[in-house]
């Protein structure tokens, strides 16, 4: 589609050559009588035409009355003439342009209709209806139109059905091998029934429709070459590849005497598609294509069926080949959670493997087809072809993500507030899953724009942006890029004064994620506001917010100079209070931070001054979690070493302390057993000194 803005710069102050009312009636009738509507933006087009038809009745009524027009009404009608003229141009552009490109530009075009409706409403603001010699019902209709236009100003309308079509289009493009098509018969992993449905929904039903759409995309690429930039032209070329490839598959010529048939007529007639010696790998590919794999059976890395599911130290399950490749490439974190892997052992998930086997049997999917070794050359050849197709599919998926990310970043950089809000939300979702997605989004330059928008006055933009940065930061390389973009001050700003609690909490989560890298711990700790802001959220946040703040403080406290800042911010007293609050729900996190702060003399002093802490720790030795018990015993041992007999006497005076320590020394974790033994030895030495009494 040509850029509508270039054709819509019509000055509202330029009077038509004919009389004003004649021109208004003429342009209104031209719009109302349009025969061909675009199949994208149909609701916005229909709504706009309905408004113009209603105004046309007003113009005709005024013309018939032959009464003089008040000056303010003339100004109003000049503005309306400009709006209707631009509506006509916009509808014509949508009709004549590429339907696919209109679908990709859904937000941008919807915003243009939105702007025109707002301008129509503002023009009607100055229309003196009471001074016009028209029927009462016309006045009421125009007044209703005015009120509706003012209501529309509050919210941009984007047809959810068209949003879904666009999502379906992106999904199809991610599954299509656009850049690596071969001349062989195995042309990727597309569900062509779904492709045909998408194309039909935007008006591509016949072979000529496909040919026309390709021509429109070619024209659009030429128009954008000078103004849209390489990214836009590349996106249009990708769309042309999709339509061309789909056309060749949706319409096939089975014989010289036969006409082209849509794929829905022969997709399930396998005898016409495959010859008798079709390979088993081909049937495997078809079965996988037509059967919907449950999400819980898909590997989070490859999104393929997990044929050999294994569990990593974080507790998440992956396909063995995918996670092994991930670890071997130098990563030491869980791809899904971002947690550091404490070991690289891969534990077979036999329960899930059994369920996958059962699902494969019930759905006629050959479980071991792609992994069974076979020495004959034919099987090897088909196995290699499957591997190539798999690589090609992954590349196509990455290309689709890159195209989407580039498009969204462009809207993020130049769009209106509404467009930026939608783009930030979509980047947030795109960055939520997959390390490749996070890497690609950063590579196309999203991070600097996201950092800038952290201080947006729009609460939703701020929330989406800080969450997107948190999601992106899960990929280790992005942590450096985010810090290099100067994000920390803006993130802290959101943490302190965020417009929503969710934004503040996600800012804390972002700091937690960034602080996993040692250099980032130093930079964050150097900010005079970061640690006090985290302590503030620890006090004011929800359970999730408190936990995010506590884990961020724990990470920062690992760097010794940060411990003093945490203590000075009043964290110790607050953490002890949270231990006493059953509803807070962050006992383990609070204990972990207190245990780390023992390594700082100021922290130790603050912890010693808490009179209620020791009884709490004794109770946690009995009822706490494994981690809670470990950190409780760490704190008690540290206090005993520092305070000596004073804390020892308090422990011995509590009848529950010795049984709890003995139980922990016998049945606790290795770390807890070791520290429980050390504490029992200290208490034993204290008891052996008879001159001390309880």
UniProtKB/Swiss-Prot annotation:
GO terms for biological process: arbuscular mycorrhizal association; nodulation; protein ubiquitination; response to molecule of bacterial origin; response to symbiotic bacterium; response to symbiotic fungus. Phosphorylated by LYK3 in vitro. Phosphorylated by NORK/DMI2. The keyword Membrane applies. Exhibits U-box-dependent E3 ubiquitin ligase activity in vitro. Negatively modulates successive stages of infection and development of rhizobial (e.g. Sinorhizobium meliloti) and arbuscular mycorrhizal fungi (AM, e.g. Rhizophagus irregularis) symbioses, in an ubiquitin ligase activity-dependent manner. Negative regulator of the LYK3 signaling pathway leading to nitrogen-fixing symbiosis (e.g. infection and nodulation) by rhizobia. May be involved in the discrimination of rhizobium strains producing variant Nod factors. Keywords: Cell membrane, Membrane, Nodulation, Phosphoprotein, Repeat, Transferase, Ubl conjugation pathway. It is found in: Cell membrane. It catalyses: S-ubiquitinyl-[E2 ubiquitin-conjugating enzyme]-L-cysteine + [acceptor protein]-L-lysine = [E2 ubiquitin-conjugating enzyme]-L-cysteine + N(6)-ubiquitinyl-[acceptor protein]-L-lysine. Its EC number is 2.3.2.27. Its main location: membrane. Disruption phenotype: Increased nodulation in plants infected by S.meliloti expressing modified inefficient Nod factors (e.g. nodF nodL) or in the mutant lyk3-4 infected by wild-type S.meliloti. The gene is PUB1. GO terms for cellular component: cytoplasm; nucleus; plasma membrane. CDD domains: RING-Ubox_PUB. This is U-box domain-containing protein 1.
């Amino acid at each position: 589609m040509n850029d509508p803005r270039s054709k819509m710069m019509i000055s509202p102050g330029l009077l038509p050559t004919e009389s004003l009312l004649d021109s208004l009636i003429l342009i209104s009738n031209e719009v109302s009588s349009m025969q061909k509507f675009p199949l994208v933006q149909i609701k916005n087009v229909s709504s706009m035409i309905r408004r113009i038809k209603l105004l046309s009745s007003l113009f005709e009524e005024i013309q018939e009355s032959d009464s003089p027009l008040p000056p303010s009404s003339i100004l109003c009608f000049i503005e309306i003439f400009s709006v209707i003229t631009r509506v006509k141009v916009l509808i014509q552009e949508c009709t004549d342009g590429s339907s696919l490109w209109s679908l990709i530009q859904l937000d941008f075009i919807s915003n243009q209709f939105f702007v025109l409706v707002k301008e129509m409403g503002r023009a009607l603001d100055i229309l003196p209806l009471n001074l016009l010699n028209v029927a009462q019902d016309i006045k009421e209709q125009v007044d209703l139109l005015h009120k509706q236009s003012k209501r529309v100003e509050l919210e941009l309308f984007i047809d959810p059905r068209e949003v879904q079509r666009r999502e379906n289009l992106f999904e199809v493009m991610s599954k299509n091998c656009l850049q690596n098509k071969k001349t062989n018969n195995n042309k990727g992993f597309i569900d062509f029934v779904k492709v045909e449905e998408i194309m039909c929904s935007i008006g591509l039903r016949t072979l000529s429709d496909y040919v026309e759409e390709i021509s429109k995309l070619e024209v659009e690429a030429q128009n954008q070459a000078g103004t849209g930039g390489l990214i836009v032209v590349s996106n249009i070329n990708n769309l042309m590849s999709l339509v061309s490839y789909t056309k060749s598959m949706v319409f096939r010529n089975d014989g010289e005497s036969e006409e082209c048939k849509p794929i829905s007529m022969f997709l399930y007639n396998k005898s016409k598609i495959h010859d008798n010696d079709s390979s088993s790998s081909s049937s495997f590919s078809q079965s996988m294509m037509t059967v919907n794999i449950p999400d819980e059976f898909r590997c989070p890395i490859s999104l393929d069926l997990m044929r050999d599911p294994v569990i990593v130290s974080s507790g998440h399950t992956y396909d063995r080949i995918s996670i092994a490749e991930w670890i071997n490439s130098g990563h030491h974190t869980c791809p899904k959670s971002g947690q550091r892997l404490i070991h690289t052992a891969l534990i077979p998930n036999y329960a899930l493997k059994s369920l996958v086997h059962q699902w494969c049997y019930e759905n006629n999917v050959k479980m071991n087809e792609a992994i069974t070794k076979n020495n004959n050359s034919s099987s090897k050849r088909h196995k290699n072809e499957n591997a190539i197709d798999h690589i090609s599919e992954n590349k196509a998926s990455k290309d689709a993500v890159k195209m989407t990310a580039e498009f969204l970043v462009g809207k993020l950089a130049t769009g209106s507030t509404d467009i930026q809000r939608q783009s930030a939300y979509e980047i947030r979702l795109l960055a939520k899953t997959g390390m490749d997605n996070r890497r690609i989004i950063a590579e196309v330059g999203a991070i600097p724009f996201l950092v800038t928008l952290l201080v947006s006055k729009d609460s939703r933009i701020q929330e989406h942006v800080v969450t997107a940065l948190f999601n992106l930061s899960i990929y280790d390389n992005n942590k450096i890029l985010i810090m290099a973009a100067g994000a920390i001050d803006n993130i802290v700003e959101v943490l302190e004064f965020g417009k929503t609690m969710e934004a503040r909490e996600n800012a804390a989560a972002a700091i937690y994620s960034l602080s996993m890298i040692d250099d980032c711990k130093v930079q964050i700790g150097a900010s005079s506001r970061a640690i006090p802001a985290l302590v503030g959220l620890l006090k004011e946040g929800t359970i999730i917010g408190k936990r995010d703040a506590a884990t961020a403080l724990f990470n920062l406290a690992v760097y010794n100079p940060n411990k003093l800042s945490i203590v000075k911010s009043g964290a110790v007293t607050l953490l002890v209070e949270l231990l006493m609050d059953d509803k807070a729900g962050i006992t383990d996190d609070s204990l972990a931070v207190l245990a780390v702060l023992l390594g700082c003399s100021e922290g130790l002093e603050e912890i010693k001054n808490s009179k209620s802490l020791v009884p709490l720790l004794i109770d946690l030795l009995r009822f706490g979690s494994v981690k809670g018990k470990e950190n409780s015993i760490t704190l008690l041992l540290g206090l005993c070493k520092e305070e000596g007999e004073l804390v020892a006497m308090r422990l011995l005076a509590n009848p529950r302390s010795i049984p709890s320590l003995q139980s922990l020394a016998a049945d606790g974790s290795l770390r807890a057993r070791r520290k429980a033994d050390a504490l029992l030895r200290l208490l034993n030495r204290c008891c052996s000194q008879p001159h001390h009494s309880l």
